[in-house]
Curated annotation (Swiss-Prot):
Keywords: ATP-binding, Carbohydrate metabolism, Kinase, Nucleotide-binding, Transferase. InterPro entries: cNMP-bd_dom, PfkB_Carbo_kinase, PfkB_dom, Ribokinase-like. One of its GO terms (molecular function) is tagatose kinase activity. Its EC number is 2.7.1.101. It comes from the Bacteria. GO terms for biological process: galactitol metabolic process. Induction: Up-regulated by growth on D-altritol or galactitol. It comes from Agrobacterium fabrum (strain C58 / ATCC 33970). Gene3D superfamilies: 3.40.1190.20. This is Tagatose kinase. It is an enzyme of class 2 (transferase). The lineage of its organism: Bacteria, Pseudomonadati, Pseudomonadota, Alphaproteobacteria, Hyphomicrobiales. It catalyses: keto-D-tagatose + ATP = keto-D-tagatose 6-phosphate + ADP + H(+). Involved in galactitol and D-altritol catabolism. Catalyzes the phosphorylation of D-tagatose to D-tagatose 6-phosphate. Disruption phenotype: Deletion of the gene does not result in growth defects for either D-galactitol or D-altritol.
Amino acid sequence: MRQASVLAPHTNGPTVTAGEILVEIMATTVGDGFLEPQTLIGPFPSGAPAIFIDQVARCGGTAGIIAAVGDDDFGRLNIERLRRDGVDVSAITTIADRPTGSAFVRYRENGARDFVFNIAHSAASETRMTDEAQALIEKAGHVHIMGSAFAIAGIGAIILEAVKSVKARGGSVSFDPNIRKELAQGDEGRRLIDDLLAVTDLLLPSGEELQAASGLDDEEAAIEKLLAAGIGEIVLKRGANGASHFSRAHGRIDAPGLEVEEIDPTGAGDCFGATYLTCRRLGMRPGKALVYANASGAHNVTKRGPMEGAASLAELDAFMAAQLSEEVL
């Protein structure tokens, strides 16, 4: 049983992730799917790893991503957004004969969403360990793992190599197990999750993901099992109800959500996790980091487009102040 782990400070090197970059194109009307011509808006830069790493940079952290895009405008708009916001894009490869990934999204009347994805056959599937990717890994102080990235050929191996390298230098790892519970029930999926949990310093699950990670349905028992295994911090995302921090060092800390009008929830969890991680790596205590993370997720859902709600800490301060003023009035 390993000792409870801690997050590497920002001075150890940048936060690095690997995974899909895509564009999101959204229907402007509510309805069922894409079976008839309709008005669309976009393209917006997207992809969970890209949203996450963009928010790390917006919060003041050093950040880089290993990914692949097509030689097209969809790829260029993503690279330019990430570069503008301060992300190291040197390890993003341009693939000449594959398009940048895409996701078409339409909301139903009940709030559910219909998606049409092109990821498996996009440039993302050609992500490889290049010299630039290796150089980025060698200077990294922290690796963020997106569970969904393991569904894309080649990316899982890059992540595992990055974890091995960074851990050997005293760095740390965060893990967003954005995986469905049933995927964790097979032997291979369960082994992968257990291997990732064994190196995780910060776990960022939602409710169902907590069950998938722990194998337990009871929240309290699941948290205790994971902390006992040596994970330093668990931050449980509760959506509009806020979030909870659990650790041996600080116990349980709950932070309420902010009441906002939801425009587009895509990317809110990624912004939340990126903000919490970056605040902690910058030396902020868990309770304060949790407040900023909740604000980040809430701010993100008020904008149309998954990366359009990314915000700096100063912008989140202003957002929270405005929310407080509205409550007082």
